[in-house]
Amino acid sequence: MKEVIDTVGRRKTSVARVFMSPGKGKIVVNKLPVEEYFKDEFKRSQALKPLVTAEKQDEFDIKVNVKGGGLTGQSGAVCLAIARALVEFDESIRPTLRTERLLTRDPRMVERKKYGKKKARKSFQFSKR
């Protein structure tokens, strides 16, 4: 059994690298406590959802390096990375996380802007007369 599990999670343009080791439940994101980094309760709960689902909140110390994108993308990336680390630690958790869709990379990306339009789909104002 490896002492430190190293996994990567991605969401939108964010990339999270998680280093998970057995411990007392200390979670650090970019050298800040998780409560300070993800101040919004929803984003924090989304990032830590795999631990709650697997009921392993106090069993691991987790160090996260996350870069790129905004807080929503970053919390999604952290979520996927933690889920992958849990599966690497204990394969029996996989079905539980799979049913909660925590092991699936969200493929949705920002749609590119098209020429002749204001944004990806929004057109300029059209006047018939």
From Swiss-Prot:
Highest taxon of source: Bacteria
Entries under SUPFAM superfamilies matching the protein: Ribosomal protein S5 domain 2-like (SSF54211)
Record's GO cellular component terms: cytoplasm; small ribosomal subunit
GO MF, any single term: RNA binding
Region (Disordered): 110-129
Protein's name in the database: Small ribosomal subunit protein uS9
Native source species: Chlorobaculum parvum (strain DSM 263 / NCIMB 8327)
Signal sequence, start to end: none
Gene Ontology BP term (one): translation
Alphabetical UniProt keywords: Ribonucleoprotein, Ribosomal protein
Biased composition (Basic residues): 114-129
Protein family: Belongs to the universal ribosomal protein uS9 family.
Gene label: rpsI
